[in-house]
């Protein structure tokens, strides 16, 4: 049985990916924090990917594939720490793949790397420029991770590098920024804007990562769910009340509250509730046969629970 190492396995999405892959592979998990929901039969290493011990684990375990989900995506951590963990951790994973003959690497990127800009076309494909850091410097690390992994994709053709850029992920287990935003009772929005947004269920994301490994998909892929809805529909369907605010007041207020630790999102996030960032997921569907199993109603219901 082939072996898969799942980094970030203690997180909600990593845990789901490990459990899905365990149906067909021997699973080894790694994370900085304890894996509280670890099935007893699966091995786990609590470690920092940036440290030498991670390389020791890869050398000893010799995984066939690595599913890399060990990223800090919230903004509660210091920016320098987030950047170090995300970028230096990914570089260490990539180097270990080259050194120890890992055959496949799946990197869990984000749709946020494209950025939310007024000139964005609807349903961007994978060739669209990565503008995320132009107006949202707080996610610059995600853009750099995606770019770094893309370079390995071409430099090391013997490794099937798969970069997956999912749209907004919601579910019972994941703790995404968009999930926290939609769980607010009164949800601030930018007055005069109501962009189309896409969502995907966490279980479908786990299935997509498993399919990427099973089909040895190689390349950069958008990952989309069952469709798109206006932001205010998503707010209503998840039980919130939209509160439109003039941007001239909202942006400085968000900047101040974020700096003081009173609001969880930096001001750059405002653009994602103004402008569209919708993706075309047809390439991944063609490469793997992926079809989302969860509809929008089930996705939104998972947030209301």
Predicted regions located by residue number:
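N-terminal Rossmann NAD(P)H-binding glycine-rich loop of SDR-like oxidoreductase domains
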Residues: 2-23
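Amphipathic terminal alpha-helices
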Residues: 283-286, 291-305
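Conserved Rossmann-fold NAD(P)-dependent oxidoreductase catalytic core, especially the SDR/UDP-sugar
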Residues: 92-138
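NAD(P)-dependent short-chain dehydrogenase/reductase
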Residues: 152-202
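Mid/C-terminal beta-alpha module of Rossmann-like enzyme folds, strongest
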Residues: 206-267, 281, 297, 301
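NAD(P)H-binding glycine-rich loop region in Rossmannoid oxidoreductase-like domains
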Residues: 47-88, 96-99, 116
């Amino acid at each position: 049985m082939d072996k898969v190492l799942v980094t970030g396995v203690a997180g909600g999405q990593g845990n789901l990916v490990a459990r899905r892959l365990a149906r067909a592979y021997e699973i080894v998990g790694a994370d900085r924090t304890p894996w509280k929901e670890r099935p007893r039969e699966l091995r786990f290493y609590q470690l920092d990917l940036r440290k030498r011990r991670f390389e020791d684990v890869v050398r000893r375990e010799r995984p066939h594939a690595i599913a890399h989900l060990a990223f800090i995506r919230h903004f509660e951590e210091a920016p320098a720490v987030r950047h170090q963990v995300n970028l230096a951790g990914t570089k260490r994973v990539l180097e270990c793949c080259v050194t120890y003959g890992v055959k496949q690497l799946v990197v869990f990127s984000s749709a946020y790397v494209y950025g939310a800009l007024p000139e964005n076309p609807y349903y961007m494909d994978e060739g669209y420029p990565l503008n995320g850091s132009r107006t949202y410097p707080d996610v610059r690390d995600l853009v750099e991770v995606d770019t770094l992994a893309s370079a390995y994709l071409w430099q090391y053709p013997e490794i099937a590098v798969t970069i997956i850029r999912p749209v907004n992920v919601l579910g019972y287990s994941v703790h995404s920024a968009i999930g926290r935003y939609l769980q607010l009772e009164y949800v601030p929005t930018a007055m005069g804007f109501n962009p189309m947004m896409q969502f995907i269920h966490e279980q479908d994301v786990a299935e997509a990562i498993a399919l990427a490994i099973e089909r040895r998909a190689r390349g950069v892929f958008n990952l989309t769910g069952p469709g798109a809805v206006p932001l205010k529909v998503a707010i209503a369907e998840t039980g919130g009340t939209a509160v439109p605010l003039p941007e001239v007041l909202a942006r400085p207020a968000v900047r101040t509250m974020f700096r003081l630790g009173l609001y969880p999102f930096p001001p750059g996030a405002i653009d994602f509730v103004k402008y569209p960032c919708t993706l075309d997921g047809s390439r991944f569907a063609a490469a793997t046969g992926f079809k989302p199993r969860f509809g929008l109603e089930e996705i939104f219901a998972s947030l209301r629970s």
